[in-house]
Amino acid sequence: QADVIHLHWINQGMLSLNDIRKILTSGKPVVWTMHDMWPCTGICHYARECNNYQQECHDCPYIYKGGGRKDLSYRTFRKKQKLYSYAPIHFVTCSHWLKEQAQTSALFEGKSVTNIPNAINTNLFKPMNKKEARAKFMLPEGKKLVLFGSLKITDKRKGVDYLIGACKLLAEK
């Protein structure tokens, strides 16, 4: 029997809002670690420039052909409002930025939000001698190296513009 129920990323059909209601009415304390904005918005994983979630989601600018006053974002926002009233949820974010966004959400009014950054194994991920590192990974010595990783480089949040700018600066030198 669980003492605490700890939710993480529950989207893509893993848990429905009805499933979450069942969890909240179980009588167990619930901690929900947020990995995106979905818990604090109507339907967005990342709200971009939209601040509707701070009052009430509706007329969603990201719904194909535009949303309406009672679009999916509105209906889901209302369902979450009701859902979150069933029992206290302690929300945890993995970044200060996400905590700030969550705290401005009308859905989180009076809710507890804590930031706990993702842990890094500092025994494994630590600085090492540059020459040894380049030799280990067969990288050339005396050359500038640029590393960039992204699942989708067309997503501006991932910083591809900075990569392009850095490459241009390096090419000029």
Report the location of each language-model feature.
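Membrane-proximal helix-turn-helix segments that form the acceptor-binding/catalytic region
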Residues: 21-25, 38, 50-91, 106-115
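Generic beta-sheet signal
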Residues: 33-34, 94, 116
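Structural motif
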Residues: 3-4, 90, 145
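Short aromatic-enriched loop/helix-cap "lid" or pocket-rim segments at secondary-structure transitions
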Residues: 19, 42-47, 52, 105, ...
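A short helix/loop element that forms part of the nucleotide-sugar donor recognition site in Leloir-type
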Residues: 126-139
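Carbohydrate-associated surface elements
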Residues: 97, 119
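Short N-terminal targeting/anchoring amphipathic segment
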Residues: 2-15, 29-35
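Conserved donor-binding/catalytic core segment of Leloir-type glycosyltransferases
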Residues: 140-158, 164-168
